Design a protein with these regions (language model features):
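Non-DNA-binding regulatory cores of transcription-related proteins
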Residues: 57-58, 62, 66-141
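Short, hydrophobic-biased segments on the C-terminal half of alpha helices
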Residues: 44-48
C-alpha cells in the first residue's frame, strides 16, 4: 500500500535532493524543515516503505547504521569523510574484469568505499590543541 502523504513526499524530496547518502537523523532534521511535526517513527516507517518500493536504497557501511539514497543513481561508489563522517557519491564505473578475485572465482557484485577527508574538512582551520598557547614560546626552543 503506497501512502502519499506530506511527510512521505518531504522525506523522498530530502533524499532525492541531497546529492549524497543521508543518515536517518539527517533525513529527520531536513524533513522537519518542511514538515515540523515529522517524527523519527514516521521517518523509519517511510524509509522501510520506500526501500520496499525500490524508490531508495540503503547504503551499508561496516559497523554503522544505514544511510539512504535514491535508486536512480546508477553505478557509483562511496567516499566517507573520516573527520565529519559524511558519505558522498563517486560516479564512475570499474570493469568487473579488473576487480581482483581468487583464481576460478566469479565476481557477481561489489561495493567500494573510499575513506579520507572531504574538501570542507580539509579547508577548516585547525583549532589549537587544548592547553597549548600558540603565542607562548618554549624555553627549550
Amino acid at each position: 500500500m503506497e501512502r502519499n502523504t506530506r511527510q512521505r513526499n518531504a522525506i523522498l524530496a530530502v533524499i532525492s535532493e541531497a546529492g549524497r547518502p543521508l543518515s536517518t537523523q539527517e533525513i529527520l532534521v531536513k524533513g522537519q524543515a518542511v514538515v515540523p511535526s515529522l517524527s523519527i517513527a514516521t521517518v523509519y516507517r517511510t524509509l522501510k516503505d520506500l526501500t520496499a518500493e525500490d524508490c531508495i536504497l540503503p547504503v551499508k557501511l561496516p559497523g554503522e547504521a544505514d544511510r539512504y539514497e535514491i535508486t536512480t543513481l546508477g553505478d557509483h561508489y562511496h567516499f566517507k569523510c573520516s573527520s565529519c563522517s559524511k558519505v558522498f557519491d563517486i560516479h564512475g564505473r570499474i570493469k568487473r574484469s579488473s576487480v581482483p578475485a581468487p583464481a576460478d572465482f566469479v565476481v557477481e557484485r561489489y561495493d567500494l568505499i573510499l575513506y579520507g577527508r572531504c574538501s570542507d574538512c580539509i579547508n577548516k582551520p585547525q583549532s589549537p590543541q587544548r592547553g597549548h598557547d600558540p603565542f607562548k614560546r618554549s624555553i627549550l626552543e
